[in-house]
């Protein structure tokens, strides 16, 4: 049985309030400021009646022989009341201004803190999610949750607090004032209350639905923009400007269309509420003209009731306006909380080791990616011991990189078999301990927008010495180009190393793996971006790195794995051949054909 939209909204709202607990002092201060602000408005209207009735009174007619004669002396004013009025007004509005400052500052502080806390939580949660989740999610939507959705939540929270407390107190104060002065005239408000409530309920559902659609549309905008920026060179090279422009225009127009839906709902709801309110005001004016009412009304009383009704219109309008903002925030909360409720990467293992020997074994491993029927790996079985090099070769999509990904538990859920490191299942290791035993250099190098030195020492921030960094860079043959840079190791590489060539980025990644000094080394096309000369230069460094380490090398260039202790030929998830370079050539099978394609006879 699913929860009703009302129950779901209340659940989300209660969860959101949990973020305000650490700021309860500031929250209470802001609420007090808002209450004072609303009460001052109500108090100001309450002074209208006494000010008119006592400050001014009708001119007293002259009496001659029992006949009242009109005079031209105007009103008889109570000077004491008139003298006090300016002082009261100044004091009240000074108090109102101070209350406004306190509440505005407090709400701004809480909104900024809420954005910071939620963004931090979402960012940290991304780091705990499995690779399989990140693979299937739209990057633009993930970024939008950190940037756009958290802003929506904070804005909605601030607007809702201001309107619900300040405008709510104002409306309640005005209603109390009206009933105190004339409960008969004030009863008409109770008639329109349910009608207003019905309109707000209907519009709220529309707001929430459209707001979710807006968040999806914003994610699409972010994704399309990111895709164009990342592929900017390819777009220009292949003349894809018109295609990308048309694609973005379509997505952009969809986003505009969703925003217009929300604008229409807002534009209809606010005037509708005001029209309903005008009927109440018109009824009060009509009722005041009835003889039965005149006996109970003074000029001051009527002015107070009329002023209170007029003063209520703007707060009521604000409450209907904030409803749209609030529903937008609730929709954003729902998407963010759904993300935060996504289960993090499974880490049930408890086994830890400072440094493993590096004996790696696959025991009859079968594996399928989520949502795919065909097995990515089918009964993979091999063993590689400390100091040995295992090479994986085969066509693209044959399953080589999947084997490497399973070693680091980027993907879990084996259909059969087990993977063991030093005769202990990798699923018994804690994730931190397991991954500290592995150094990975993948085909697609990731560098961070930082210095070369910090990228090399990424696994040991603040711990690796300058000498260790230089040594790793030297072994990777990276110092050759680093020394030619104006700032050397302190050179900023730009976003994802954009200021460096592909080969330079690859060498920095290799230096990073060297500094890691892990017992298991995975090289997934580690030299793919290097030219022949650079590849030869770095090969000696890789040979040095492999000593006393278990190395798993994935390569298309067969020249880089000729010295491997064992070569596995993988095709459609199965091991079809295994042996040394020499024995596989003599076998004359798939490996020999691949070798012949690259080097001829």
From Swiss-Prot:
Molecular function terms from GO: ABC-type oligopeptide transporter activity; ATP binding; ATP hydrolysis activity; ATPase-coupled lipid transmembrane transporter activity
Cellular component GO terms, alphabetical: plasma membrane
Domain ABC transmembrane type-1: 28-328
Entries under PROSITE patterns matching the protein: ABC_TM1F (PS50929), ABC_TRANSPORTER_1 (PS00211), ABC_TRANSPORTER_2 (PS50893), MSBA (PS51239)
Location in the cell: Cell inner membrane
Keyword check for ATP-binding: yes
UniProt main location, coarse: membrane
Entry's free-text remark on domains: In MsbA the ATP-binding domain (NBD) and the transmembrane domain (TMD) are fused.
Protein's name in the database: ATP-dependent lipid A-core flippase
UniProt source species: Shewanella sp. (strain MR-4)
Native organism taxonomy: Bacteria, Pseudomonadati, Pseudomonadota, Gammaproteobacteria, Alteromonadales
Gene responsible for this protein: msbA
């Amino acid at each position: 049985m699913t929860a009703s939209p009302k129950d779901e909204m209340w659940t989300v709202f209660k969860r959101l309030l949990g973020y305000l607990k650490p700021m309860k002092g500031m929250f209470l201060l802001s609420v007090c400021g808002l209450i004072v602000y609303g009460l001052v408005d109500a108090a100001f209207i309450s002074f209208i009646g006494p000010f008119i009735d006592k400050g001014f009174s009708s001119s007293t007619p002259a009496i001659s022989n029992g006949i009242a004669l009109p005079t031209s002396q105007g009103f008889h004013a109570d000077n004491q009341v008139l003298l006090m009025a300016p002082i009261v007004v100044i004091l009240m509005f000074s108090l109102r201004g101070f209350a406004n400052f306190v509440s505005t500052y407090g709400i701004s502080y809480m909104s900024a803190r809420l954005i910071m806390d939620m963004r931090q939580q979402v960012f940290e949660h991304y780091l705990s999610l499995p690779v399989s989740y990140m693979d299937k999610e739209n990057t633009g939507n993930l970024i939008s949750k950190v940037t756009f959705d958290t802003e929506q939540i904070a804005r909605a929270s601030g607007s809702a607090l201001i309107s619900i407390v300040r405008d709510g107190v104002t409306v309640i104060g005005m209603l109390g004032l009206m009933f105190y002065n004339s409960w008969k005239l004030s009863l008409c408000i109770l008639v329109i209350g349910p009608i207003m409530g019905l309109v707000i309920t209907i519009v709220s559902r529309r707001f929430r639905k459209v707001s979710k659609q807006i968040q999806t549309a914003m994610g699409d905008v972010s994704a399309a923009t990111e895709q164009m920026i990342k592929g900017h060179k390819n777009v220009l090279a292949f003349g894809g400007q018109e295609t990308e422009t048309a694609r973005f225009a379509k997505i952009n127009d969809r986003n505009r269309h969703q925003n217009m839906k929300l604008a229409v709902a807002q534009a209809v709801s606010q005037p509708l509420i005001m029209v309903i309110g005008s009927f109440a005001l018109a009824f009060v004016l009509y009722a005041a003209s009835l003889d039965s009412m005149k006996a109970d009304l003074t000029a001051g009383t009527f002015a107070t009731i009329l002023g209170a009704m007029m003063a209520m219109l703007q707060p009521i309008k604000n409450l209907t306006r904030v409803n749209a903002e609030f529903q937008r925030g609730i929709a954003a909360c729902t998407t963010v909380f759904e993300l935060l409720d996504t289960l993090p990467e499974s880490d049930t293992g408890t086994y830890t080791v400072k440094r493993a020997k590096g004996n790696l074994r696959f025991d009859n491993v079968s594996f399928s990616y989520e949502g795919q029927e065909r097995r990515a790996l089918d009964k993979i079985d091999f063993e590689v011991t400390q100091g040995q090099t295992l090479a994986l070769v085969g066509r693209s999509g044959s399953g080589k990189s999947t084997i490497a990904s399973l070693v680091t538990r980027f993907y879990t859920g084996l259909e059969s078999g087990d993977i063991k490191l030093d005769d202990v299942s990798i699923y018994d290791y804690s994730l931190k301990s397991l991954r500290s035993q592995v150094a990975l250099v993948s085909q697609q190098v990731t560098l961070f927008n930082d210095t070369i030195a910090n990228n090399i020492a990424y696994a040991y921030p603040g711990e690796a010495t300058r000498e260790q960094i230089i040594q790793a860079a030297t072994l990777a043959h990276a110092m050759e180009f680093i020394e030619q840079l104006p700032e050397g190791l302190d050179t900023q590489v730009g976003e994802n190393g954009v200021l460096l060539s592909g080969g330079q980025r690859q060498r920095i990644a290799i230096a990073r793996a060297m500094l890691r000094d892990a017992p298991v080394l995975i090289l997934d096309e580690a030299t793919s971006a290097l030219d022949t000369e650079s590849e030869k230069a770095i090969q000696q460094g890789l040979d040095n790195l492999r000593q006393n380490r278990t190395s798993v090398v994935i390569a298309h260039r067969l020249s880089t794995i000729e010295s491997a202790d064992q070569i596995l030929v993988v095709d459609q998830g199965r091991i079809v051949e295994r042996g040394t370079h020499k024995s596989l050539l003599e076998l004359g099978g798939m490996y020999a054909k691949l070798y012949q394609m690259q080097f001829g006879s």
